Amino acid sequence: MPSFTRLATAAVHLGLLAQSAFAKPYHREDPKLGAVASESSVCSEIGIDVLKKGGNAADALVATQFCIGVIGMYHSGIGGGGFMLVRSCEGKYEFIDFRETAPAAAFQDMYNNNTALSLYGGLASGVPGELRGLERLHKNYGSLPWKELVMPAVKVARYGFKVTEDLVHYMETTTPSNKFLTDDPTWAIDFAPHGYLVKLGETITRKRYADTLETIANDGPDAFYTGPIAEATIAALTKQNGTMTLEDLKNYTVAIRKPSEITYRGYKLTGTSAPSGGIVTLSTLNIVNGYEDFGDPAAINLTTHRLDEAMRFAYGQRSELGDPLFVEGLDAYQASILSNKTAAEVRSKISDFRTLNVSAYDPEGFESLPTPGTSHIVAADKSGLAISVTTTINLLFGSQLMVPETGVIMNDEMNDFSIPNSSNAFGYIPSPANYIRPGKRPLSSISPVIAESPDGKLYLVIGSAGGSRIITATIQNIHHVIDQDMTVPEALAQPRLHDQLSPNQVSFEYAYDNSTVAFMASLGHNVTWVAPGQSTAQGLRLLPNGTFEAGGEPRQHNSGGFAI
């Protein structure tokens, strides 16, 4: 009998999500040691192996994250950054912001004449923070040696891994009009070693990246921020007109911020604060917390409308958010957003009979920032230590700049800033609170959440990838688990809706109930249908009997949630 639980790893095809398309679990009868879930079953297994060897959830998370940077390089890697929420075994929370920062030479109008420069090439990258984030987690919470946690990813990169359905999908999504994976020699070494793009089932290696990770395994994260690796990074960026310097890399530090929290149906929900999207997630849930029978199947149509309206108001609140170091009064504003008074005021504005004009949601300078190149991981252990983390290089394959000597894929996070007098590449209105400043961190939709049961014990660790859809996916998954008493795999398999206020429409995955969508249309919502897979979540739960369950995103072919 296998020694771990595997849940929710089956592929989802268009329109089939309503059949709860997750794999039948196979498991040990008593998985009480811990759990890991990520977008790669290979990487989740590495995390589980760490738990087997006596490591804790922090160790498992670090090992899993390094592996994701190898296999899920289109989403994540040490050339990017992210946000991490940690619950200690004593029940204390820490929000580690390792988001990329604008280089010292960055300025507000740097992309006014060519917004494409914020997407591709040397000017598109913020200073990477992933390694400093993992370093902080390991130093404060880890138990096994750093090298022991990095080396599994080194082996995967050096000796290769199978080209999966997910990798094929993301390569095909990226390359129809841009053949950089095959035409750029720096990329082709890995992605087209035989003159053609690697195919499903073939083995792909990333040997330069393996060497880089091995150096970091031996010498620690400083090896990335100073010395030959740093020099190669800056040289590659400079060659493509970048202005990042060795000083920018050397001076990067994580920001430790105050987490945000609400009480929802008696459960304590802890999330992240600005510049992440955690406030929007918790604000939505705080608004609907005032509705009775929110999980009643008989009221599903009205519940869907109310949830969507709460999302729209919360996205309107988002327009004033940014980096707290650069936006005056943000702490007080965030506190007011999550107050019960504000939630009640919003509920009083929500009509059960119609949706409202966009202006009613107060979207001053509203901007939404899709970030498709994101990856989420959750990990927890029997002590109650739990981590929910989302990492990103922004767009798929980041800035499409790989450092030739190191194999590091650089982010294009600078596009997440607002550009004055110009909508960003996705057509959204600029938000002054999110204008570029040297050292500033751009606004994000990333929203990791950890829930405690009414008795104060760890209950749910959840989060999502998928740009602006991160927020709405996380909201719905929490709603399914807490209001509708679903397991994590069941919750992840439910069809999702998404409404970010701008554009003024609500999208439904193909499997969503037709009668509910018709009801929404009858209230004036602009409804549209989308294929599943635009948001990808991972989650785990600690049950009252002390056993864990975990779920990988069923919209991804190769995700994996495991418990041991």
Residues covered by each model-derived region:
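Fungal secretory targeting signals
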Residues: 1-23
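Noncatalytic scaffold domains of N-terminal-nucleophile
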Residues: 24-45, 49, 55-219, 224-226, ...
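Active-site rim segments in enzyme catalytic domains, especially the processed small/beta chain
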Residues: 70-95, 243-245, 386-454, 484, ...
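Short beta-strand scaffold segments in enzyme catalytic cores
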Residues: 76-77, 81-88, 375-380, 448-451, ...
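Internal maturation/activation junctions in enzymes
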Residues: 195, 290-393, 405-406, 413, ...
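Short, small/polar residue-rich loop motifs at catalytic or cofactor-binding pockets
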Residues: 256, 371-374, 396, 444-446
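Extended C-terminal subregions enriched in glycine
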Residues: 324, 420, 440, 474-475, ...
